[in-house]
């Protein structure tokens, strides 16, 4: 299973092509759109989300509500393109029009792709970098993740996400499965502990008032993953390694950990390894989940717990120092419309990125042309956990 996205932030649309989804998976546009809507929410979002509707159109790979096994194409229309038609149009323009073009960017933002991307691709107008490096592209990745979640749910694998920390205000690092899944989306900061939700909002408001931005930590949980997905044999097949790459590829994400994460460095081995037990009904299990559902790069049947660290968004309304690439003079960086805090929305993005990595790994482990074949193989693997 793989995918490709295309489109610019203020271009006409985002396009996704997903290859490798088995035939006969029931997919409805409204189910994908529910996930798209979650990404648009969250306290601290900017004005852009009031413009966009982010509803997807399925244009190939699905017939009468079921996948065909051929590539699936999804389209997300950028409603804001109506205001950018001249600036972001594909038709050639004259040199005079280019010189007088509005919204040209020559003052790169520290922490963004602007300057290095301009150097690498020889763009003198850094908007050519900004448009693709923008987090707008994550709308396409959520669409991919939504399809992945639909697939996983047919296998009784379920994903949830939450915010753990915003601007130094922290919730508990770990919750039990029921507490986690029964308390997502309770509030607009996506934190489980309601007592700190307002503190997080106040912190976001403070950053916005100061023209600044703040980051945080998000957590994703995947429940009921079958054992043995991934591999200890080769580095590139380790499931936690693949998830780590996927998570840090999300815009502004700077770190990833599993289970108790970096706290493992503070504890002795006797307190961080998860002891193995056996039950005749359910098979092998662990009473604890310090390692976040992984052993040796493989899923061990416990809930998979992924933590992602998001830095503050680099676009600031009180911009930092920069240099104009044309004059080489000191200037304040360009101000572009942005969020003061996107951590709640980023938790949704992270959930869908993890969903894709899990779906991809499952389909590699249990190669199947259609859903009945896949379901049967998953059932057999789960039985192995009892009979081995």
Curated annotation (Swiss-Prot):
Its cofactor is FMNH2. PROSITE patterns: CHORISMATE_SYNTHASE_1 (PS00787), CHORISMATE_SYNTHASE_2 (PS00788), CHORISMATE_SYNTHASE_3 (PS00789). Gene3D superfamilies: Chorismate synthase AroC. Reduced FMN (FMNH(2)). One of its GO terms (biological process) is amino acid biosynthetic process. GO terms for molecular function: chorismate synthase activity; FMN binding. It catalyses: 5-O-(1-carboxyvinyl)-3-phosphoshikimate = chorismate + phosphate. The keyword Iron does not apply. Its EC number is 4.2.3.5. The keyword Flavoprotein applies. Keywords: Amino-acid biosynthesis, Aromatic amino acid biosynthesis, FAD, Flavoprotein, FMN, Lyase, NADP. Pathway: Metabolic intermediate biosynthesis; chorismate biosynthesis; chorismate from D-erythrose 4-phosphate and phosphoenolpyruvate: step 7/7. Homotetramer. This reaction introduces a second double bond into the aromatic ring system. This is Chorismate synthase.
């Amino acid at each position: 299973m793989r995918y490709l996205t295309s489109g610019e932030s203020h271009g006409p649309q985002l396009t996704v092509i997903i290859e490798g989804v088995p035939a006969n998976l029931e997919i409805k546009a409204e189910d994908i759109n529910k996930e798209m809507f979650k990404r648009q929410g969250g306290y601290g979002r900017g004005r852009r989300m009031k413009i966009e509707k982010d509803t997807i159109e399925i244009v190939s790979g699905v017939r009468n509500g079921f996948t065909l096994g051929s590539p699936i194409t999804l389209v997300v229309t950028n409603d804001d393109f109506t205001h950018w038609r001249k600036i972001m149009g594909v038709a050639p323009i004259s040199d005079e029009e280019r010189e007088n073009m509005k919204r040209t960017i020559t003052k790169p933002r520290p922490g963004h792709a602007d300057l290095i991307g301009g150097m690498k691709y020889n763009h003198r107008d850094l908007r050519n970098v900004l448009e693709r490096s923008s987090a707008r592209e994550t709308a396409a990745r959520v669409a991919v993740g939504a399809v992945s979640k639909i697939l996983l749910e047919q296998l009784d694998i379920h994903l949830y996400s939450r915010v753990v920390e915003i601007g130094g205000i922290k919730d508990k690092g770990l919750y039990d499965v029921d507490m986690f899944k029964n308390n997502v989306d309770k509030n607009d900061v996506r934190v489980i502990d309601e007592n700190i939700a307002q503190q997080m909002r106040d912190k976001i408001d403070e950053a916005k008032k100061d023209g600044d931005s703040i980051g945080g930590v998000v957590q994703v949980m995947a429940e009921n993953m079958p054992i043995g997905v991934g591999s200890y044999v080769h580095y590139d097949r380790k499931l936690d390694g693949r998830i780590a790459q996927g998570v840090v590829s999300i815009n502004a994400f700077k770190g990833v950990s599993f289970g108790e994460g970096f706290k493992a460095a503070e504890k002795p081995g006797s307190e961080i390894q998860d002891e193995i037990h056996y039950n005749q009904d359910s098979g092998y299990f662990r009473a604890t989940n310090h390692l976040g559902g992984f052993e040796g790069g493989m899923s061990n049947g416990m809930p998979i717990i992924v933590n992602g660290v998001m830095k503050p968004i680099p676009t600031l309304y009180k911009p930092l120092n920069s240099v104009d690439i044309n004059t080489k003079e000191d200037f304040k960086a360009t101000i572009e419309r942005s969020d003061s805090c996107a951590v709640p929305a980023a938790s949704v993005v992270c959930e869908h990125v993890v969903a894709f990595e899990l779906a991809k790994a499952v389909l590699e482990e249990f190669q199947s042309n259609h859903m009945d074949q896949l379901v049967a193989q998953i059932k057999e693997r789960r039985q192995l956990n009892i009979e081995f």
